[in-house]
Amino acid sequence: MARIIETAILNPVEGKTRAQQVARLKEWKKHWLAEGADKVVVKELGAGNIGGAWIFEIHHKSGASYGALIDTYYKNPKSYDDVVAKWQKTPTLNIASYAVAFEVEDI
């Protein structure tokens, strides 16, 4: 059974401190864990105040658990949209790249 890993490369918004970036990443991590993600992994690339970046990974146990998370969104998109609207009012990180990977164990 394939595990699903959503991966985003994030760049800081000009003028945002590392502390502000970390605070936002903690909010995102808390949100995705509450939504049912198996785990969230955050990796820092370079120094956050000197053109650094972040890798933000949302891990799902299986395709079914990833699908359940997507179904949750479509059942009540307003709750998700409200959270995103809050984050957009104080932009801290820009998503430079995003991908969904399927980790297949039987190959």
Please give the residue ranges for each predicted region:
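Intrinsic disorder/low-complexity detector
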Residues: 1-3, 91, 101
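Active-site-flanking beta-strand signature of metal-NTP-handling nucleotidyl enzymes
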Residues: 3-11
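Short hydrophobic/aromatic beta-strand micro-patches
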Residues: 11, 57-59
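Short, surface-exposed ligand-recognition loops at beta-strand->loop->(often short) alpha-helix junctions
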Residues: 11-23
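An amphipathic, aromatic/His-enriched active-site/gating alpha helix that lines ligand/cofactor pockets
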Residues: 23-41, 49, 59-97
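A short, glycine/Asx- and small/polar-enriched loop/turn
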Residues: 50-54
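Long, low-complexity, Ser/Thr/Gly/Pro-rich intrinsically disordered segments that act as flexible linkers
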Residues: 93-107
